[in-house]
Amino acid sequence: MSKRIDEIPDVEIDGTGKFKYIQIKVKDKDSGDTKLIVRGYGRCGYHNDILDEVKTQYKGFSFTCPGGGRIDHHEGNKTLFVYGFSQAYGQPDHSKAVELLKQKYPNYNITYSNEGY
């Protein structure tokens, strides 16, 4: 994988709260390398707002969204619950988000459900 794409963090989510999240497939336009990242921000009212924000942060990459949902994050209890879907992008494979979240939050109890909105 290219050094450039490795500089993009795999996971960036807000602290305690419920918020929308998306999975983003990032592709380095020069090398063709790809990777999946997770972003979730309470400040974004729509899933596409998250994608728009990420697009402005990194140049030389293309971004596609395989889907989104919501995350319920409790820092005090060290729990993350990934669930639901995005009306704009559909429902992703939440297990892929959980894999990435477990790398960033190894001491957390992280679960997911395909139910809910």
Segments and roles (model prediction):
Residues 1-117:
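Intrinsic low-complexity, intrinsically disordered or marginally ordered coil/linker segments
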